[in-house]
Regions:
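N-terminal cationic and glycine-rich segments that engage phosphates or anionic surfaces
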Residues: 1-102, 106-431
Length: 431
């Protein structure tokens, strides 16, 4: 693998893409420590040291690489974009116009991307307002009496909202730059960077905690086992054989070859985990407005925001399973695949072309997605439950969702680098 990295850096074009990607990640991390105007940075550091564990905005802070608790320019991280993407993809099912745009190809996709950007900015305004309110009323730093935002004037508030919203827009642009000019999916790599940046501090915290080295070693063993399981399942696939009939075009014979359709156990990747985690944060964010003593807000904090609450865990599992089926359905269309196969003379042995092929593919996808969704839910829950049992807390970046995202994004990025190496006749990473 190291030799493959050396070959990658010896290729000028690939080296330029890798360095560009790393450079954007560095810029992203620098922005995570730039304080927002109006925030007292020394007071923020005091509150971080003194505040109690807070699971209300734990996931947002994790996906922002700790920028949320720093109240930095990039406080919101990538979460507004993730939420906007969820809404736009849901609207594709409800609004025929959106589905028609998706089928129009590049122009339609560009239009949907534009809608996602607009919605991201709107959500960023809402979420930045929520963050400012929670910081002022003490919810962001429970147990800390120091004012992190000394000036509560309307001008300062508007300046902070504009700054955080602009930071979200800049993050979105940086992610798109990586996708266009770098290596891998830009948004996924920024999430990867945010989560990975929290690992060293979390490991140090666990090792120095009440459990000591023993708890640290047990947690590391669990993480290694979960990573091995994730890599094994993510690389597994069912191959549906496809044969192409011979056909004459002029004097030449085409077709007659055999290939296969690779069907992964987890076709949706880490998207269901991200979507489920994001949706569960919405009630907690809305609860940040208004009177914090209201009964329903206390109920939300105890049952939905707390990651170790039974209701939170149950909804988390159900949402992961739902989004597994939902995302698989919108990314793999059996009817479209069957039509393309029929158009080019392809068929599955023992299955008639056309509608029977589409029904067979749908049958296979439905049954493969079932264990895939259960696998995702288990991987997302096992580390969290283990951490609760060991008493090390749940607000650490080693949860199942974090491991799934880091490993999933890492595998996809390595595969993309490998494919570019193979195009240049080099040996790839995966042998």
């Amino acid at each position: 693998m190291l030799s493959a990295f050396v070959r990658a850096f010896r290729t000028p074009d690939l080296r330029r893409k890798l360095l560009f990607t790393v450079g954007i990640m560095v810029v992203f991390r620098i922005g995570s420590f730039l304080p927002t105007p109006g925030v007292s940075y020394p007071n923020v550091q005091v509150c971080i040291d003194q505040s109690e564990s807070n699971s209300l905005l734990g996931l947002v802070n994790l996906f922002s690489g700790g920028a949320l608790l720093q109240l930095s320019v990039f406080s919101l991280g990538i979460m507004p974009y993730i939420t906007a993407s969820i809404i736009i993809q849901l609207l594709r099912v409800v609004i025929p116009r959106f589905e028609a745009l998706h089928k129009e190809g590049q122009s339609g996709t560009a239009k949907l991307t534009q809608y996602t950007r607009y919605l991201t900015i709107g959500l960023a305004v809402l979420q930045s307002t929520t963050v400012i309110i929670t910081a002022r009323n003490g919810q962001l730093f429970p147990g800390c009496s120091v004012d992190v935002i000394p000036d509560d004037s309307i001008v300062t508030t508007l300046l902070m909202i504009v700054t955080m919203t602009a930071g979200t827009g800049l993050i979105m642009w940086l992610g798109e730059l990586i996708t266009e000019r770098g290596v891998g999916n830009g948004m996924s790599l920024l999430i990867f960077t945010s989560i990975a940046a929290s690992f060293p501090g979390a490991m140090w915290s666990i090792a120095g905690g009440s459990g000591g080295i023993g708890a640290f070693l047990v947690i590391m063993a669990i993480i290694v086992l979960v990573i091995a399981l994730v890599v094994f399942v993510e690389q597994s696939q069912r191959r549906i054989p496809v044969q192409y009939a011979k056909r004459m075009v002029g004097r030449r014979t085409y077709g007659g070859s055999s290939t296969y359709i690779p069907i992964k156990i987890n076709m949706a990747g880490v998207i269901p985990v991200i979507f489920a985690s994001s949706l569960l944060q919405v009630p907690a964010l809305l609860a940040g407005f208004g009177d914090q003593t209201a009964g329903w807000k206390q109920w939300v904090a105890n049952n939905l925001a707390a990651t170790d609450a039974p209701l939170h865990i149950a909804l988390y599992v159900l949402l992961i399973i739902f989004f597994c089926y939902f995302y698989t359905a919108i990314t793999f269309n059996p009817d479209e695949v069957a039509d393309n196969m029929k158009r080019y003379g392809g068929f599955i042995p023992g299955i008639r072309a056309g509608r029977p092929t589409a029904e067979y593919l749908d049958y296979v996808i439905t049954r493969i997605t079932a264990p895939g969704s259960i696998y995702l839910a288990l991987v997302a829950l096992i580390p969290t439950i283990a951490f609760i049992v060991l008493g090390v807390g749940t607000n650490i970046p080693f949860g199942g969702s974090s491991i799934l995202i880091v490993v999933g994004v890492g595998l996809e990025t390595v595969k993309q680098i490998q494919s570019q190496l193979e195009q240049r006749h080099y040996e790839g990473f995966l042998r």
